[in-house]
Amino acid sequence: MARLLLFPSQACVDPGRHLLLHPPVSRPRAVRSGPPPAAPRRTGVVSLPGRCPPPLCWNHHPFLPCRSSKRGWVVFASENVQEISSHLPRKDERRSGNLLLRFSALPYCTMAWLSTAQLAQSSVGEKLNMVYEVGELFELGIQLSYLLILIGLLGAGTFFVIRQVLVRRELDLSAKELQEQVRSGDASATEYFELGAVMLRRKFYPAAIKYLQQAIDKWDRDEQDLAQVYNALGVSYKRENKLDKAIQQFQKAVELQPGYVTAWNNLGDAYEQQKDLKSALKAFEEVLLFDPNNKVARPRVDDLRPRVSMYKGVPVKSEKR
């Protein structure tokens, strides 16, 4: 059986014979009275509603009409299927073309929208990834800086601890050797002084006072060098809060060596602790005579001068201990 090709104008084509059926446009639609027509047979021709299929004209010209005397059908014979589209109504052609354009443009618009959305999403994702990476790098830098600071602090602390341990060990070894010499009775005044200085650095003040006093008793060298022994003995008394004895030792030290600025500073500090501001100011001024840029005496003089001028003429009792 031949297949049919239907068009919007309700014409049909029989591929077997290349027939084009089209109802006459100029003739009015006839109204038929009587019983309804029988169902058309499958002859490769489709009839219009209310009309019977016309007889086929096989031997006519491909595009010359063949009129039926009974039903008024017009039959066109076509040898080429491509020529059929030229006989379609122009309005139907334009409508079909518009529909095809719309439906064909829809997938392209959808794809363009999807691609734009994907690009926007990818750009946003890239920005978020960049921000996240920058945040990670910043956090990593902070952690590394904290780690370096911690390592530096630990290194500095370790250095000071090791240094203190080494100093303490050296002092212990020195004290041990000096004590052995003192026990043997062969120790000199210098060795007693060294042992007293070691005990002073180890903060064993009573032992330091004992050995320094023995060094003064056995001193047989230059008296100016003895000023250092008196100064160390005064520091030991001062650490024991025995300010009167400390001042006596400092005075002996500056008597033996007038330019001994360390003993003068210690003497001024001891007077200031006793609230004897005038004597303290005098001691610090003596330091500036020998060392005008002394970092210990200069600020103390600047602080004591206004205080002494304010209390001038008012007796200030010193606290004796």
Curated annotation (Swiss-Prot):
Pfam families linked: TPR_16 (PF13432)
A Gene Ontology BP annotation from the UniProt entry: photosystem I assembly
Primary location recorded for the protein, binned into one broad class: plastid
KW S-adenosyl-L-methionine (keyword) present: no
Entry keyword annotation includes Cell membrane: no
Recorded topology in the membrane: Multi-pass membrane protein
GO cellular component terms given for this protein: chloroplast thylakoid membrane
Top-level taxon in the UniProt lineage: Eukaryota
Transit peptide limits: 1-29
SMART domains, per the entry: TPR
Matches recorded under PANTHER family: LD24721P
Protein name per UniProt: Tetratricopeptide repeat domain-containing protein PYG7, chloroplastic
Lineage: Eukaryota, Viridiplantae, Streptophyta, Embryophyta, Tracheophyta
